Amino acid sequence: MRAYVPFAAFCLSVATAAGAANLVELREPAKIADSFSARAPVRVVNVWATWCVPCVEEMNDLRTISNTFGTQVSLLGISLDDMIPGDRNATKRKVSDFLDKKRITYTNIYYRGNSDALGDKLRFNGEIPITIVYDRTGREVWRQQGKLDREKAIAQIRKMLGGK
């Protein structure tokens, strides 16, 4: 019996790590850039919330983009769920559970900072969802306000990667 315990523990740890959402709490918009993979030539930011219907509808498309391009694209979600008053810990758990249910494994920020500061940093008026694509230097290349058009986003990313 004892020989099976380490194996079972290993299986549980692998299953948890493979399916677990990467949710990071952040208050300062200036630190968003630190959340990107330094190696990725394309960086994508998607601002969303669990209560936003078009945000939820586009999650599968974002997961597809993340899976399609792998390490060539650093995709970062920014959840605005904390902007609604309530129990912050419960809301953060809700976001984490939502990401797990949707099988989202790319990094997501649980944003707890000032919404105006975030809007200024990303140059948007607070209307979500919004998806912004940057090159490695941080120069904005493309943005889409509203529900993501997956084919347009993929075409833009392919163009940035040299047609790969």
Q: Model-found features: residue ranges?
A:
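Structural microenvironment flanking redox-active thiols in thiol-disulfide oxidoreductases
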Residues: 59-101, 113-119
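Conserved redox-active cysteine motifs that mediate thiol-disulfide chemistry
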Residues: 47-64
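Thiol/disulfide oxidoreductase modules built on the thioredoxin-like
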Residues: 102-104, 111-156
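Hydrophobic beta-strand anchors of alpha/beta hydrolase catalytic cores
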Residues: 44-45, 75, 131
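A short beta-strand-turn-helix
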Residues: 22-43, 66
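Boundary at the C-terminal end of the N-terminal hydrophobic targeting segment
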Residues: 17-21
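Bacterial N-terminal signal peptides
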Residues: 6-15
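Short pre-active-site segment immediately N-terminal to redox-active cysteine/selenocysteine motifs
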Residues: 40-43, 48-51, 127
